[in-house]
Every structure is written in C-alpha cells, then in structure tokens.
A protein has these predicted regions:
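Active-site-adjacent betaalpha module
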Residues: 1-97
Length: 97
C-alpha cells in the first residue's frame, strides 16, 4: 500500500487472476503505455511460474517497453529454479535489476 500512495488512483489497476499469467495485465499495459515510453517492473513470490508468466505476457503485449525484474524481490521453490528463471528472462531481453 505504501508504494501505491505515490500514484494517483487513476494509475492503479488491481487485477485478480485465477491462474499464473494474466492476459488482463497485458491488455492494461497496452492501454496505459500508449505512445509514452514506460518501464514495467516485476517482483513476486515464484520467479519460475508467476513472475516469468506475467513478464512474458508484458513482453508480448508491449514489446517495445522496458520490462524489468527486481531479482532480490523475487523467490522460487529452490535457488536453482530461481536462477534458471532469471536466466530465461535475460535471454528474452528482460532487464534484471
């Protein structure tokens, strides 16, 4: 909630998703990014499932935008699976911070 306080209510979109990836996220990104240059940051609990799924959706819907993953704000089932997911995203031109 504290991070959200930096943004006006018009800039906050809550997406409820019953599965790992969210097409609704991609549609929202496409709508909000428009012609303006944007950076989209991701973090999450499961790097190898939820994070990578949504990162790839973002890359598909807004391929020209900068998509970043905050590595230290992510985790996975094992350290090895976390590293594997991070390396896979690097290969797909995702910036790892």
């Amino acid at each position: 909630r504290k991070a959200a306080s930096f943004y006006s209510k018009e800039q906050i979109e809550t997406i409820c998703k019953p599965v790992f990836g969210s097409v609704q996220l991609g549609e929202c990104l496409k709508q909000y990014c428009g012609d303006a240059e944007a950076q989209i940051d991701f973090c999450g609990v499961c790097t190898g499932i939820c994070v990578i799924s949504n990162v790839m959706i973002a890359k598909a819907f807004v391929p020209e935008e900068r998509v970043c993953v905050i590595e230290k704000a992510c985790a996975c089932v094992t350290p090895e699976s976390h590293r594997t997911a991070i390396e896979a995203m690097k290969t797909c031109q995702v910036d790892i911070q």
